[in-house]
Curated annotation (Swiss-Prot):
Residues 172-214 form the UBA domain. This is Ubiquitin-conjugating enzyme E2 21. Signal peptide: none annotated. Acts with E3 ubiquitin-protein ligase trim-21 to catalyze the 'Lys-48'-linked polyubiquitination of ced-1, promoting its proteasomal degradation to maintain appropriate ced-1 levels for apoptotic cell clearance. Disruption phenotype: RNAi-mediated knockdown results in increased levels of ced-1. It is an enzyme of class 2 (transferase). It comes from the Eukaryota. GO terms for molecular function: ATP binding; ubiquitin conjugating enzyme activity. It comes from Caenorhabditis elegans. Residues 21-168 form the UBC core domain. Pathway: Protein modification; protein ubiquitination.
Amino acid sequence: MSVSKLNKMQFSDKMSNLALARVTRKCKEVANASDITEAGIHVEIKENNLMDIKGFIKGPEGTPYAGGTFEIKVDIPEHYPFEPPKAKFVTRIWHPNISSQTGTICLDILKDKWTASLTLRTVLLSLQAMLCSPEPSDPQDAVVAKQFINNYPMFTATAVYWTSYFANSKKDVEPDFNRKVGRLIEMGIRETEAIVYLSCNNWKLEQALQFIFD
């Protein structure tokens, strides 16, 4: 290898390391920012590993998610900020723009609306805002979106139940929901699966049973 080529490689590595250090510093600044903590958002970056960022978002008051804490996994890609972070909900949530099964998020700034001027702060605050303003017309989870549109009270009660069970809120839930979950558990269905089956069938026990055993 020629000296000039080696020098170019070393220069490229140095620039990559500088870019990584700059991005890491900026992400840490977001994690420690007062507006983030005041909004009820906590960020953990383990050992400067931008592939292992955890966000914890408190559910906004006045929503079915109030009282819950939702964990989000964030990965900062190699070409950030020229491509968006990858984010998904680790804590399960009943929301039309978030998959109830995988935590995949439908949010435009995580896709085609991302620009290099946006930041990790923007992502976290936008995710929290999304809990206040679901968009069922552009869903990630079609089942949740259908319930939101056709039976909003049922959607709200279901979202409250999921927030209580998965996100540890202290909100009161529909007693009848607990009874129906108990019935499925007695039949050998695991509790988490029972909640999902009933939620997807508007908490109609017979309909859920037909879905399970057909």
